[in-house]
Amino acid sequence: MSDFSQTVPELVAWARKNDFALTLPTERLAFLLAIATLNGERLDGEMSEGDLVDVFRHVSKTFEQTHETVAQRANNAINDLVKQRLLNRFTSELAEGNAIYRLTPLGISISDYYIRQREFSTLRLSMQLSIVAQELRAAGDAAEEGGDEFHWHRNVFAPLKYSVAEIFDSIDLTQRLMDEAA
């Protein structure tokens, strides 16, 4: 755990004084994730406002929002992410009106967290399916061996009823969470 040199009241006062806030409704979070994906494709990590508007247009289309106001809503979303310190805006007097944007470490961390969660869910699902395959193979081998009622109950029935059924329930839950996230 981190050691903070400030007290709780000092940190609270500092956050209040600087007006720190994070608000990421689903649309804004999707926009941040889309920006992170675009950012990953750039060697220099720099994006133009036009790039961000194009990404927002895709998010807006996915959320089935009107296309007539997309430029203004994109501008509002960009300004919101800048205000929340998820994006940095760099302007130059030489290139007036052409700002360059970069994700901040906070923006990168938040997007990485959500992207990693999705990848973890996919990996977890793959592992669960592999375990089910092993359990089914073992139960099938035990069934081919034959044996008495105790053998069938212990090596075929019990693994299928408890182990495989439990894993299938877990797979179902993981898949539902992934579907909700998609």
From Swiss-Prot:
Origin: domain of life: Bacteria
Pfam families per record: KicB (PF03882), MukF_M (PF17192)
Main location: cytoplasm
GO biological process terms on file: cell division; chromosome condensation; chromosome segregation
Keyword Cytoplasm part of the UniProt annotation: yes
Gene Ontology cellular-component annotations: cytoplasm; nucleoid
Keywords in alphabetical order: Calcium, Cell cycle, Cell division, Chromosome partition, Cytoplasm, DNA condensation
Assembly, per entry: Interacts, and probably forms a ternary complex, with MukE and MukB via its C-terminal region. The complex formation is stimulated by calcium or magnesium. It is required for an interaction between MukE and MukB.
Record's function text: Involved in chromosome condensation, segregation and cell cycle progression. May participate in facilitating chromosome segregation by condensation DNA from both sides of a centrally located replisome during cell division. Not required for mini-F plasmid partitioning. Probably acts via its interaction with MukB and MukE. Overexpression results in anucleate cells. It has a calcium binding activity.
Record protein name field: Chromosome partition protein MukF
Native species: Edwardsiella tarda
